């Protein structure tokens, strides 16, 4: 696999990440707040957003270009992003993705900041989602 560039994307370039999502038929949108992270092989091949919430961060918008899936890009992008932040990180995902995230150190949680608990309750009305989290200590293992 070629050397990929994992780095932050300035908010001023957020439209590039939104364009990447749209080009692959994803309804995801890059967060207007927080850090945007991308993996590049020339152009963007994966992206995610990390938004500060309470004493930690909320990971959203993880998407990898289909031809790059199964090659470790998502895990490496997450690892690079989480290495730069202190405190716990949470995400919501479909239950089928639980194993993928558990391999990265995340675990199922029901303890969420109230703002995220409210979002999860609202989102869960229309789709099947679970909450996962990772502590600062687990990020460093």
What are these regions (language model features)?
Residues 64, 70-83:
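Conserved acetyl-CoA-binding loop-helix of GNAT-fold acetyltransferases
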Residues 1-31, 36-38, 112, 127-141:
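Short amphipathic alpha-helix that is part of the acyltransferase structural core
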Residues 83-96:
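Conserved GNAT acetyl-CoA-binding A-motif
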Residues 46-49, 75-80, 100-103:
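Hydrophobic, well-ordered beta-alpha structural blocks that scaffold small-molecule cofactor pockets
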Residues 60-61, 67-69, 103:
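Acidic/histidine-enriched, beta-strand-rich ligand/metal-binding domains
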Residues 38, 43-52, 56-63:
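Conserved beta-strand in the GNAT
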Residues 95-122:
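Conserved active-site alpha-helix within GNAT-family acetyltransferase domains
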């Amino acid at each position: 696999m070629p050397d990929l560039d994992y780095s932050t994307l300035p908010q001023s370039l957020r439209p590039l990440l939104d364009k990447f999502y749209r080009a692959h038929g994803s309804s995801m949108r890059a967060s207007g707040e927080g850090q945007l992270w991308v993996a590049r092989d020339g152009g963007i091949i994966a992206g995610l957003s990390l938004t500060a919430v309470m004493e930690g961060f909320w990971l959203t918008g993880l998407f990898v270009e289909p031809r790059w899936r199964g090659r470790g890009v998502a895990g490496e992008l997450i690892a690079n992003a989480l290495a730069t932040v202190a405190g716990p990180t949470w995400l919501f995902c479909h239950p089928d993705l639980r194993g993928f995230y558990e391999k990265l150190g995340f675990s199922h949680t029901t303890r969420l900041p109230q703002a995220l608990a409210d979002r999860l309750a609202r989102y869960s009305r229309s789709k099947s989602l679970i909450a996962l989290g990772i502590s600062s200590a687990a990020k460093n293992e």
